[in-house]
Amino acid sequence: MAASLHIILDTDPGIDDAAAIAAALFAPELDLQLMTTVAGNVSVEKTTRNGLQLLHFWDADVPLAQGAATPLLRPLRDAAYVHGESGMEGYDFVDHQRQPLAKPAFIAIRDVLMNAPEPMTLVAIGPLTNIALLLMHYPECRFNIHRLVIMGGSAGRGNFTPNAEFNIAVDPEAAAHVFRSGIEIVMCGLDVTNQAVLTPEYLATLPALNKTGGMLHALFSHYRSGSMQSGLRMHDLCAIAWLVRPELFTLQSCFVAVETQGQYTAGTTVVDIEGRLGQPANAQVALALDVDGFRQWVAEVFACAP
């Protein structure tokens, strides 16, 4: 099958990001044109190093641009306590000479968008700082964005604070700007990503699958060793899965606002499922997932990798 959907991936690798990057590279329906990094799971220097390591591991001819080192207005709160000090503990990647592009991520994204023959799809699986910077500096670029698919947010409980999901909570101001931008947004938040669980039985097959499976198994074992026995949530993979298999997801058009001021609620995505606020919808929010179909797709795409 010829690749039909050209995408830009903004990411903060991060162990679960590695699985999403694999899918973006090897799902036959996708053509990854640019990868950009942002501070999130760990510092941007580390997410950039990790992204370059992954591209070298797969010998992927994809340019990478380093992005924002800090949120727009706040100090960075990372997740090194989950992903390890380097962000991808658990696998020994070989040395390489790859370097990022000599321009920041938001400019690299602008350049790819403006040179594309038609509007492109952006996929953001980390904090939305780079996307906000793009829209703030080059608001005209929104007409060159077909759609933004994000892993972030929640219509219910959070995973970083009681109400806020990590990617949004790291940079609420950036997320608020993006949701107000008028671009088409598909939000794959915790409502579906908490359902996207790979079984211990499947995880145990990864080392024998291919070199990608071996690498991911090593990362996953370090990332969530207990989950290797109970099942592992694949948060970031959901954004890639929606691009390829949207029929697996149940979406609802909603107005989504991002809280930036609350002492206890900053970073919360207020998802107006019942339309109580009387505001026009600004996002398609994924609320349910065909879990068996998702697992089948993951197995298929990982088997396509080297």
UniProtKB/Swiss-Prot annotation:
Q: Which residues form a coiled coil?
A: none
**Where does the record place the catalytic residues?**
235
Listed GO MF terms: purine nucleosidase activity
What sort of enzyme, by top EC class, is this? hydrolase
One GO biological process term: purine nucleoside catabolic process
Keywords (alphabetical) are: Glycosidase, Hydrolase
> What does this chain do?
Hydrolyzes both purine and pyrimidine ribonucleosides with a broad-substrate specificity.
Give the family from UniProt.
Belongs to the IUNH family. RihC subfamily.
The record's annotation in PANTHER family points to:
INOSINE-URIDINE PREFERRING NUCLEOSIDE HYDROLASE, NON-SPECIFIC RIBONUCLEOSIDE HYDROLASE RIHC
Q: What is this protein called?
A: Non-specific ribonucleoside hydrolase RihC
- What is the organism of origin for this protein? Salmonella schwarzengrund (strain CVM19633)
Give the taxonomic lineage as stored in the record.
Bacteria, Pseudomonadati, Pseudomonadota, Gammaproteobacteria, Enterobacterales
Q: Which gene encodes it?
A: rihC
